[in-house]
């Protein structure tokens, strides 16, 4: 068994993936987008467990599973024994005992997956669909696929990530891998929402200092659900100070692209009429999510078969 297969028993954090593995997943995602097929004859079983609300991640994993011909075991948190006090560990232990091959999990607890993948009893593979404000590897991979399709490389690209940095698992996943891939990173947004850990990966700037220099301008959602109740900014003030206005859009380089992991607070992070503007790749990101998640599932299942 190769080192690559061993490492992909689970996909839980971008920190755990090598650059080679990341590039293979991106390129395989592009192959799936171009029509590659891989029907499974042994009917692997996948269960999606979402303990936080989701549209894009949840549904694109479902579409990816359908396209791969996998068997899906529906799991509804609201009608499960979780509501009787069952722990996440015991829930996954049960699904593993039932023969589920892969569990795709989103959970509010950061690093929830560590206990699961360390268990000698749980044999199901874990794909992290987002852990609180920790990591979001599949979102990061679809972002990378979108950038790679546009530019064909990462080395030397200037990438700005702007918005609610501290609460964003997308920012934390992307900053680590983009630096390893050779991109130059800039971070913008309210000072109240940026911790010192970002300084290890790039420069803190204002959006107006960097908007006309970047190749990729990535905005982040203001995550109201992870903030204390007292609002720091009104929507109007936030948009004026930190959002993509028409004036800022006009300053982007001709070849620059606009990204956002969504859901979008329109007229907060990005002006409503700019969400689908010519430089926007937001819809493409959503589309690419299906294909890169197909690549993730394929790689995890291949690793299981190799075992």
Swiss-Prot record:
One of its GO terms (molecular function) is amino acid binding. Keywords: Pyrimidine biosynthesis, Transferase. GO terms for cellular component: cytosol. PROSITE patterns: CARBAMOYLTRANSFERASE. L-aspartate binds at residues 84, 169, 221. Catalyzes the condensation of carbamoyl phosphate and aspartate to form carbamoyl aspartate and inorganic phosphate, the committed step in the de novo pyrimidine nucleotide biosynthesis pathway. Belongs to the aspartate/ornithine carbamoyltransferase superfamily. ATCase family. This is Aspartate carbamoyltransferase catalytic subunit. It comes from Streptococcus pneumoniae serotype 4 (strain ATCC BAA-334 / TIGR4). The gene is pyrB.
